[in-house]
Every structure is written in structure tokens, then in C-alpha cells.
Amino acid sequence: GGKNPALPFGKIVVALLRAIKGERYRSDLVKKLSFMGYNSRFDKSEGENAWLTRAGELVADRDSDERTNFTFTLAGYNDLFTMLGECNGSQWYSQYPKNLPTILIAGTDDPVGNFGEGVREVYDGLSKAGVISLDIDMYEGARHELFNETNRAEVFRNMCDWLLGVCG
């Protein structure tokens, strides 16, 4: 959530590498640039994907499983960066359906959401755009994958309660 000032640079790097290597190439450089710093607040002993969750066994599984610990293709990074640019652009907020009930959920230790700041930025943008039914739930200490967090039962319960409240 929120704007990422490095996004234009990332798109340029991906475009250059795609021109040289092709869109199906898997670049360790782009992976490193994309995720560098995500683990910086966490103890190295927690694993290379500690930024995803506090659940150590899930991090260990993620770190050791090639099906979940892989490098996107350059086409995948291009699509991801394009989507991030569109979803964080000023026009996105004005185009968002005003009557769509929306909840933003995030962990306060999620580096992707800038430790809560990016999610609040998105919330503020949607609020200023006039979204009528808008909620935010921040989970103290939780990281990126809330449904794989140590408090996942609480997250699921809160999401079910919110959905029941909206859908009645």
C-alpha cells in the first residue's frame, strides 16, 4: 500500500532486461532490488522470508520450497510494477466505486505496506475520494501475509464479522 518512489526505476530496469534477455527470464537482480530491505527489521535467524509472517515454521517452509521461494519472470515483474503504479496513482482513487464497501487490512510490521503508513495513505486517499463504507484494521506486530500470521484466527474472525456486517 502507498506510493513507492523506486517504482519508476524498477520499471526501467525490467524494460531494459526484457529487451536483452526476454520476458521469461528470471532475474536475481530484479528480485533483490524488489525485496531488498524487507527483512532488515527482523533477525536474520528468522529466515530470508521473515518479512512474510511471524510464524517461524511457515517461513522455514517458504524458504525451503522452490514452489513458493521462486523468482518471477521479467514479464511477471512488469505486470506487478504496472499494477502497483496504477493502484497508487491519483486517478485510481477517483475511479474507485464510491458505494463499494471496502476494508483495508494490514500488519504494522509489513514492509510492503511501509509498516502501516502506506495502508493509511491508501485509506486517506479513498476517504478523500468519497468512498462511503470504508474500514481499516491494523494488526499490531503482524507482517505481510495476515492469513498466515500467528494471529490468523483473529484475522479470519474479523474478516468474517466484517463480511457479515456488510452482507447481513
Provide a role label for each language-model segment.
Residues G1-R67:
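Alpha/beta-hydrolase-fold enzymes
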Residues P111-E121:
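Conserved alpha/beta-hydrolase "acid-adjacent" motif
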Residues L104-A106:
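Short beta-strand/loop motif that positions the catalytic acidic residue
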Residues T108-P111, A142-R143:
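Acidic beta-to-alpha connecting loop that harbors the catalytic carboxylate
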Residues T68, T73-S94:
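Active-site nucleophile elbow and catalytic-triad environment of alpha/beta-hydrolase enzymes
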Residues A129-G168:
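Catalytic active-site module of serine/aspartate enzymes centered on a nucleophile-bearing elbow/loop
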Residues Y96-T102, A129-I132:
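Short, proline-enriched alpha-helix->beta-strand connector loops that line the catalytic pocket
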